[in-house]
Amino acid sequence: MFCPECGTWNRSSAATCSRCNAQLPDVSKSPEKPDEEITNLRHVTGSRYCVQKRLGGGGMASVYLAEHAHLERPVVLKVLHGHLAKDPEMLERFRREARAASQLVHPNIVPILDAGEADGVLYTVMPYMPGGSFSDRIGAGAQPPVEVASIVAQAAAALDYAHRRGIVHRDVKPDNVLFDEDGHALVTDFGIAEARFHGRLTASGRAMGTPHYMSPEQAMGKLVDGRADIYSLGIVMYEGLVGFPPFDGPDAFAVGYKQVHEVPVSPVQVNSEIPAALAEIVMRCLSKPPADRYARGNDLADALIAWIASTGETGNAMRDAWTARRATPTGAR
């Protein structure tokens, strides 16, 4: 559990915080008016997980902090919203995440530890990432170029690994890049990923993904391959460097239209202090024709690592990027 005073994580059996000695709540007791979804989740998971609190959520699912009762390690439970669990299409989309992610074993991909389904409640279990998301960091403002390059290089290597196994993520965005306790970047949420041989993935004719990070071909509902994820990584990199994505609009259609038809302003034109060579890498990722982008995630990772090296950086940024790249040897499956 997390200390309500200082935020330090403690085992569920602890009575006081290991850091500040504050009294910790007894998580074995349910709150007087528990959230209905938490109540259902506790019923479904039984004694296996100690569900502690809601961390947040999106349009598809709610995310809860829990502790594995036997291993005493913090985990995250992602629970499909109840009304969506009744929709066969969304139900299959949620199940797809567990199936897709279970095939992926890479140090820069958040693994699925477990999954369950009972009484209309569907959930997946993942390790808790205490470092937050890239979105959290960007929320504080534009990030240092070397850090952005390292984070995207790690994500690119992880996605290359997935692509070589026939899986395209399709929803790469800052929210889906998380950090572990050591600051390593991990890609998560393969919720709309699908093996290439299954063909296009649309819902009732709609393009799937997040408009601000969606490739042109995805916005048009076309078949996509790994280069769609490269485009999305370009937008993630752009946002990390300047603090906002290249395209915005009053609605999803307007943003999607710009993804297809408009050329983004170079990051250098937004902030002249951004290195031109790094901006060129970003703009290549954002090429409208997929053939003009980096062909593979490893190609992008290599370009970013070379750029980091050119700055003279030899610290954690270079180490983390290079470690991720070595975990994804070219040609390996």
Regions found by a protein language model. Give the residues of each.
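Protein kinase glycine-rich loop
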Residues: 52-58, 63
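Protein kinase catalytic-loop region centered on the HRD/HxD motif
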Residues: 157-167
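Conserved short submotifs of the Hanks-type protein kinase catalytic core
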Residues: 119-133, 137
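AlphaC helix of the eukaryotic protein kinase fold
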Residues: 81-103
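Activation segment signature within eukaryotic-like protein kinase domains
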Residues: 151-152
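Activation-segment/catalytic-loop signature of the eukaryotic protein kinase fold
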Residues: 115
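Juxtacatalytic C-terminal regulatory tail of Ser/Thr protein kinases
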Residues: 25-38, 291, 295-333
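C-terminal lobe helix-coil module of Hanks-type protein kinase domains
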Residues: 67, 159, 178, 210-316
